Amino acid sequence: MTSMIPETKITAVRNTLQITFGVNEFEDIRQLTAGLSSALIFRIVVLGKPYLLRVITRTDEISNPSHYYSCMKPAAEAGLAPHIWYAGIEDRISITDFIEAKTFPVSVARMKMPGVLKRLHSLSPFPYRVNFFDFVDGLVRKFQDTKILPGNMTEDLFHLHAKISSVYPRNIQDMVSCHNDLKPENIVFDGDRPWLVDWEAAFLNDRYMDLAIVGNFVVKNDQEEKEYLTNYFDEDVNEYQHARFFLMSQVLHMSYFTFLLLQVSAGNKPVELNSAIPDFREFHDQMWAGKITLENNEARQEYALVHMQQLRHNLNTKRFEESLYIVSNY
């Protein structure tokens, strides 16, 4: 069964098991392939109990888990992430509790996730890495330079994004500890409560980023948005908070759209524009149900275009202009 572990990591994994559990073999192993992490993820059984084994095979500095662990550990101590049994920086191996995933109804997630996010955002500040707006602005410039799509298809979107970028607050004192990658496979529901996993993208960020990511999956109309944000803030939500949420949602659409198409184009695959673009809500419902993953370029391209279509729709609504006005005059 150790054949699943890269030969260069077998000794380190055995040492980890010995240090952690007093044995040097596991009883069962199964590789988990959901998600886009470059690390190898396994469900292992040791002394009759399942655990999650994460093995980072890359040796470059960008794969150094120091930052990842510095965010995961306080989250685990707060009961937001699974218990950590081992987290080695030099060997780049970690072992945590394995949470058996149960179906997480969207209606239940809409009620439970705001409280989880509020607890996450109340943790001591994670390390600062980058301003998310600066990151997205960089994606836009790179996208324009590579000319992945004709300019007449995207020029209006980039122009309107610039309007958001010019008015949206970037006050670092207002930033909180964020996960930044709360897609369905990183939210594991055990039948009672959700656990947050895969902390590679965590850093100090705008709270509305996490709220918008989860909102893509659980908020379907204005009333649900009101309930969702009210549950997070524990008070009636004002027009400024609604406007911040809406504008950050558009920035999120832009980031997915540009990042994923840049990723697809890096493989020298032309963007297919003749196929019908799926409905935003239906696509996210399928992702939430685990029926769609982003493991291949076809799915990533489709998801990018889903976000582009939704972004175009939202930027042409009355709410967009109202939100710009509210935030710029707050």
Segment roles from a protein language model:
Residues 92-95, 182, 218:
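Short glycine- and hydrophobic/aromatic-rich loop-to-beta-strand nucleating segment
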Residues 21, 79, 117-125, 168, ...:
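A general structural signal marking secondary-structure boundaries and capping sites
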Residues 58, 101, 194, 202-204, ...:
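Activation segment
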Residues 23-33:
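Short secondary-structure junctions
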Residues 208-240, 250-269, 280-293, 299, ...:
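Active-site activation/catalytic loop segments of kinase-like enzymes and analogous catalytic loops
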Residues 6-25, 125-180, 190, 226, ...:
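An alpha-helical support segment within catalytic cores of ATP-dependent transferases
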Residues 31-135, 140-155, 170:
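ATP-binding pocket architecture of kinase catalytic cores
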Residues 38-48, 52-53, 162-211, 223:
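Active-site acidic catalytic loop and adjacent metal/ATP-binding pocket
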